[in-house]
């Protein structure tokens, strides 16, 4: 017995000496939030003569102590080494806060999107997301046909088109759905609406590839309850509501919660979460498309430091999925940057168009005002009666004004239900730029 006590004391003293080593503590602190492949970690300079395998486990232990879910929250029937956890590093929280500040309802981007969401360049982002989700579900629709169904609201002619028309209708009421309690009944309603009149549609889903390391997931009978819990309490899975929305999305992607149309259901649930937690602008960030590109190895360092399926750190303390969450946050940030650039460019083009319109001396003030309105709302369709009432002029004058705008190549026209209607040319910016260039005298330089 005395020998055992002596051995225990010696072991404790040795362990404390190791843990109190300043160089070792510095190494652990530097690597706690710096995720590397195990092989790369083993090549790092170690403190003193420390064993790299021991340092790998020590760093993993520190991460596990800060990880979620806690050991108490996990299934005790599974050994710790088989359990999955994640952390939210300070850099991740700062990144999430920055994303929220740029995409919340009061942000300039969100206010601009309220005016510009019907512009083709903005709609393209939503179409990319729908195409990626459709690909995942084994439903392929040509891009132009999808655009007509979603953007032009053309009546669907096939079961595939009907599916996307149903998705469009759900998207139109997504903000309203976000104000309702999220429960299994709401999920069932959304799935039923999405699948309406698609019984004849045969699909072969293309699920996400399995990661190289097996990641525990909730039992199938608990999966929907887990998703509901994460949507009802966005901070359940971490210290930030947007982090929780990403965890929920990954749960649906990796462990399909729906036998049919899992990809589109994930998209709808995530977009609903964006509205519920106050980041509506993020629905124009095609996260599904970026994740799909990552799976296909179409993106790599520096945009994706780790390969898809390998963004996991495995130790005797469990499977740490933090690198995966870091990648999703990076994708959101990168997608938001792209969205901001597109919005800024769209606004710049609109202002340039209106400037050129008001500089055109061939146009009356009425015509200039109408064209400016159409630039701000390209989906607006006018007829002679509307123009007549707007400017309080005779019908003959209204018709002459509109016909003149057609002849000048500003408007397009057709007869619909025995009424002539007019709308802005889709390529109006190109038409105006060409006309401006043609009317500007060529500059000359003197040798």
Language-model features, listed with the residues they occupy:
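N-terminal structured helix/loop subdomain that forms the ligand-binding/catalytic interface
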Residues: 1-196, 435, 445-447
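Phosphate/pyrophosphate-binding active-site loops
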Residues: 2-76, 80, 213-343
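Residue-level detector of well-ordered alpha-helical segments, enriched
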Residues: 122, 126, 163-166, 186, ...
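Short alpha-helical scaffolding segments that buttress acidic/His motifs in well-ordered protein cores
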Residues: 130-131, 150, 190-194, 204-208, ...
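Short coil/turn segments at secondary-structure boundaries
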Residues: 142-147, 182-189, 201-212, 239-242, ...
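Short, conserved phosphate-binding/catalytic loop or strand-edge motifs used
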Residues: 143-153, 164-171, 206-211, 223-224, ...
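Solvent-exposed, amphipathic alpha-helical segments
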Residues: 148-152, 166-177, 223-233, 307, ...
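C-terminal regulatory or interaction extensions
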Residues: 249-257, 263-397, 401-447
């Amino acid at each position: 017995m005395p020998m055992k006590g002596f051995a225990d004391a010696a072991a404790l003293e040795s362990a404390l000496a190791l843990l109190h080593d300043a160089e070792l503590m510095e190494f652990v602190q530097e690597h706690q939030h710096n995720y590397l492949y195990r092989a790369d970690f083993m090549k790092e300079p170690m403190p003193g003569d420390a064993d790299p395998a021991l340092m790998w486990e020590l760093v993993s232990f520190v991460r596990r102590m800060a990880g979620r879910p806690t050991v108490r929250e996990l299934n005790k029937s599974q050994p710790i080494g088989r359990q999955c956890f994640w952390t939210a590093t300070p850099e991740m929280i700062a990144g999430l806060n920055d994303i929220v500040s740029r995409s919340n309802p009061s942000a300039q981007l969100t206010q601009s999107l309220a005016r510009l969401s019907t512009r083709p360049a903005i709609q393209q982002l939503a179409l990319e997301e729908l195409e990626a989700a459709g690909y995942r579900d084994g439903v392929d629709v040509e891009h132009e046909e999808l655009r007509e169904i979603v953007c032009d609201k053309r009546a669907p002619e096939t079961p595939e088109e009907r599916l996307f028309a149903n998705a469009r209708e759900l998207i139109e009421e997504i903000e309203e759905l976000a104000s309702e309690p999220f429960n299994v009944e709401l999920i069932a309603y959304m799935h039923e609406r999405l699948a309406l009149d698609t019984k004849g549609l045969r699909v072969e889903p293309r699920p996400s590839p399995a990661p190289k390391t097996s990641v525990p997931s909730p039992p199938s009978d608990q999966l929907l309850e887990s998703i509901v819990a994460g949507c009802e309490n966005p901070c359940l899975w971490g210290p930030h509501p947007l982090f929780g929305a990403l965890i929920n999305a990954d749960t649906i992607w990796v462990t399909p919660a729906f036998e049919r149309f899992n990809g589109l259901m994930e998209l709808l649930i995530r977009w609903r979460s964006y509205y519920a937690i106050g980041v509506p602008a993020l629905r124009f960030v095609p996260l599904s498309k970026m994740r799909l590109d990552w799976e296909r190895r179409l993106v790599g360092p520096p945009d994706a430091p780790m390969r898809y399926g390998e963004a996991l750190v495995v130790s005797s303390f469990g499977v740490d999925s933090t690198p995966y969450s870091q990648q999703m946050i990076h994708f959101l940030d990168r997608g938001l940057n792209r969205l901001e650039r597109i919005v800024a460019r769209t606004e710049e083009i609109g202002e340039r168009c209106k400037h050129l319109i008001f500089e055109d001396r061939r146009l009356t003030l009425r015509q200039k005002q109408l064209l400016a309105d159409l630039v701000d709302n390209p989906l607006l369709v006018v007829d002679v009666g509307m123009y007549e009432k707007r400017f309080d002029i005779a019908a003959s004058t209204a018709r002459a004004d509109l016909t003149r705008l057609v002849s000048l190549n500003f408007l397009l026209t057709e007869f619909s239900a025995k009424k002539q209607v007019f709308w802005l040319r889709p390529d109006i910016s190109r038409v105006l730029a060409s006309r401006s260039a043609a009317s500007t005298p060529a500059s000359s330089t003197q040798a």
